């Protein structure tokens, strides 16, 4: 299963979250650590789901698309 996670740099390191897994967040001092940590968080999150919830997620097809906005 391919899941999109967002990893953002902040003043304390890196913050990671999965937009469609409510509450699935993690962090790390480096990008690599945040990536490892969010992967573990996703695995734990999915491990707590029921079979029908997992089936729904496996059918979910989302795209992260960059959108350019003209802002005055």
UniProtKB/Swiss-Prot annotation:
SUPFAM superfamilies: TTHA1013/TTHA0281-like. This is UPF0150 protein jhp_0960. InterPro entries: HicB-like, TA_system_antitoxin, TTHA1013/TTHA0281-like. The lineage of its organism: Bacteria, Pseudomonadati, Campylobacterota, Epsilonproteobacteria, Campylobacterales. It holds the Pfam family HicB_lk_antitox. It comes from the Bacteria. Gene3D superfamilies: 3.30.160.250. Belongs to the UPF0150 family.
